[in-house]
Structures are given as C-alpha cells and as structure tokens.
C-alpha cells in the first residue's frame, strides 16, 4: 500500500511553513482529516493497520484515541479489530476521559493516533487510561513522522520519542520530514511566519 500516494491524492500532504502540535516547525504537514473524510479510504487504511496488529497476536480489548486528531483513525481501527472505541479529550489543557467512558481494571488498551510525531498526545491519554486501571498494550497510527521506531521499519528511535520502548508501535509508513525548533527554523529566519493547521492550540 502506497500511503504517501493516498495522502498526496487527497491533497493531504501539505507544503509550506507549519507549526506542529509538538511545537516544532516543518516545511511539510500531513492533514489526515483530508484522507479520513472518505469512509472508503479510512476503512482501507484501518484494515491494513489492523492486519499488522492481528499478525502480531496482540490481545486488545479497547482502542483509545486522543481527540481531536486521532478520533476517526481510532474509531476506524476499532471497527477493523472488532473492539470497543473510546477517546480522551482535553479539558482546560488536561487530558480526561468523559462522556461516560470507563476503563475496567486490567483492560487491554491500544492507543491510536492519525500521526505519531513524538507520541506526546498519545502518552498523555495513555496516562489517563493507566490511572483508571487500564493496561497499555501498544500504540498504532496511520503514519509515523520518524521519531519513534515502529514494527517492520529500519527507522531508529530518536531521543525525543515519548513512546515506551517495551510495547509495540504499529504504523503503515514513515514520513521522515525535517523538523526544527522554532529558534532554529530556517523559514522563520527568512521572515516566514508558521501557521498552525492541526487541532492543538499551541
């Protein structure tokens, strides 16, 4: 499956000057919402990701996604795995489980994002799940920005990856674009202003 082509065909691989949810700047941005607005494409990607997970024999009770970016990917993946789908959301800047969602003690939870950069949002949501007695058994995403090592990839883990190294990380492909701290960004130095296309207000 050519994930990059799917993103390009959906006009979801954007070029410009972007501020990512991690706070870093990049010349490229993956707008997964443009890919996932087509239910057939969402199902195609989720089915491929679910196949990887099933082949690993990982046992999962629930998929949990951090809102807003991971919502559709999480639901589509849960459907493909035939398990429960829940999401965590920010309230006053802090991740919470709301809307009647509950976690049973020992419940095996797979965290899901559309894109994993450092994995910070997924791990914030994972801490909520763990605080309620859930067990984080893995992480999944449609695409990996190349900071964390996924299953079946030769990309190595970078120091700023926030995903635990003792659980599997599944993704369909690696997108290893250059990223810069704001003070080191060459586009900022040339006078360009970064725009924020994602879903976190920072």
From Swiss-Prot:
Which cofactor(s) are needed, names only? Mg(2+)
Instruction: Could you list this entry's UniProt keywords, alphabetically sorted.
Output: Glycosyltransferase, Magnesium, Pyrimidine biosynthesis, Transferase
One GO biological process this protein is involved in is: pyrimidine nucleobase biosynthetic process
Query: Which pathway is this protein assigned to?
Result: Pyrimidine metabolism; UMP biosynthesis via de novo pathway; UMP from orotate: step 1/2
Function as written in the Swiss-Prot or TrEMBL entry: Catalyzes the transfer of a ribosyl phosphate group from 5-phosphoribose 1-diphosphate to orotate, leading to the formation of orotidine monophosphate (OMP).
The record's family statement is: Belongs to the purine/pyrimidine phosphoribosyltransferase family. PyrE subfamily.
Q: What is this protein called?
A: Orotate phosphoribosyltransferase
Which organism is this protein's natural source?
Answer: Sulfurimonas denitrificans (strain ATCC 33889 / DSM 1251)
- Give the organism's phylogenetic lineage: Bacteria, Pseudomonadati, Campylobacterota, Epsilonproteobacteria, Campylobacterales
């Amino acid at each position: 499956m050519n994930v990059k082509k799917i993103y390009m065909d959906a006009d979801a691989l954007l070029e410009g000057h972007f501020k990512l949810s991690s706070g870093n700047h990049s010349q490229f941005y993956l707008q997964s919402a443009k890919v996932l607005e087509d239910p057939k494409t969402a199902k195609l990607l989720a089915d491929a990701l679910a196949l990887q997970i099933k082949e690993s024999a990982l046992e999962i009770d629930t998929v949990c996604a951090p809102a807003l970016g991971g919502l559709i990917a999480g639901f589509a993946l849960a459907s493909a795995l035939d398990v429960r789908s829940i999401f965590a959301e920010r309230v006053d800047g802090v991740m919470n489980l709301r809307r009647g969602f509950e976690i049973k003690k020992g419940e095996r939870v797979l965290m899901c994002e559309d894109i994993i950069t450092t994995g910070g949002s997924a791990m914030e949501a994972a801490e909520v799940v763990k605080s309620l007695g859930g067990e984080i058994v893995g992480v999944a995403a449609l695409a990996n920005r190349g900071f964390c090592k996924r299953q079946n990839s030769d990309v190595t883990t970078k120091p700023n990856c926030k995903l635990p190294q003792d659980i599997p990380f599944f993704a369909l492909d690696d997108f290893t674009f250059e990223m810069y701290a704001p003070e080191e960004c060459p586009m900022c130095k040339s006078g360009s202003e970064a725009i924020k296309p994602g879903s976190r207000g920072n």
